[in-house]
């Protein structure tokens, strides 16, 4: 199977409980509530203030909103940072759950969340906790998911404030300790969510740094343990009506030392795409195995951020201190020859030598091309990283670059003693 081929899931009929009709689980529109895209990604971290500053300084984002002691949140602090439609929320506990006074006036809900957050940090370190989808019908998506076996974390509820209106949200469990929030903000006019205060002042030093032209979240990748990929994909198909958009196996994603399998699940209207990876047998430990070991289980491996100008983006990030993986020059020697000899209906718009200098990779078919690059892991645990991606009439996921990318990652694994 071609790595860029769009593949279909087995066709399963489900009952639309609003109409009583049998509907195909791969239908793109029909009765399924629409997914509008990624709303935001929530990270649970040890120090939200420092994490927010890190992404502002290195990735060119800015603090947009805040929730903490000053807004009445007595046990948690959260910072919303973002650029255009990229939104990350960093949340930290600000009290110990084991040293609270016996007469502490804390709700049972906050006590349980405080305990869960500390346990999550001990198990995973700084990590993605939640990937939020904006949908047009929270109740409909939630009910269908739960009816199909999804674990409910929080049923639909409405949050509001007098000034900005209300949002509706619900939470379901996905792979590992990761969750999905389902959010509708049609009736909300504020910057983010009720309970957050807008932040309008930014450190003066940020204005001296090169701007980073990010646009939105392109996709979020989940790593699974051995033989767990298909169960994770089945969850998205069964519970959220996603379909299999794209897939490759270990015959196509392998190096001399390791291999993996990958399936991309997409929402019914294809606006949300969630690649799911698992390790495959190889001579040594794959990057997926390394992730699962240091993350203590399945979780979000990387978040791809879309840009319309990857050269400017990567150069700006590099000047700000972001570390990217290094690609051998032999890759570009081969790519230069291919671009000169292979038939296609497009011309590369970027300066090839600048792509080489910035270690940016190229994948393409006859109709278009993709440019991409991975950062090094963002934490001391070799777990989460960021991908920068630019699409030019190309909907694939860089299968042509997988071998080169993974060989580059393996070189760093070897330095860490984890290959």
UniProtKB/Swiss-Prot annotation:
Alphabetic keyword roster: Dioxygenase, Iron, Metal-binding, Oxidoreductase, Phenylalanine catabolism, Repeat, Tyrosine catabolism
Domain VOC: 37-185, 216-376
NCBIfam families noted in UniProt: 4HPPD
Needed co-factor(s): Fe cation
Listed EC numbers: 1.13.11.27
One MF term in the entry's GO annotations: metal ion binding
Binding-site residues for Fe cation, renumbered to this chain: 219, 302, 387
Pfam families: Glyoxalase
GO BP: L-phenylalanine catabolic process; tyrosine catabolic process
Native species: Pyricularia oryzae (strain 70-15 / ATCC MYA-4617 / FGSC 8958)
Similarity section: Belongs to the 4HPPD family.
Reaction equations catalysed: 3-(4-hydroxyphenyl)pyruvate + O2 = homogentisate + CO2
Gene3D superfamilies: 2,3-Dihydroxybiphenyl 1,2-Dioxygenase, domain 1
Cofactor binding remark: Binds 1 Fe cation per subunit.
UniProt name for this protein: 4-hydroxyphenylpyruvate dioxygenase
PROSITE patterns: VOC (PS51819)
InterPro entries linked: 4OHPhenylPyrv_dOase, 4OHPhenylPyrv_dOase_C, 4OHPhenylPyrv_dOase_N, Glyas_Bleomycin-R_OHBP_Dase, Glyas_Fos-R_dOase_dom, VOC
UniProt entry tagged with the keyword Nucleotide-binding: no
Pathway: Amino-acid degradation; L-phenylalanine degradation; acetoacetate and fumarate from L-phenylalanine: step 3/6
Enzyme class: oxidoreductase
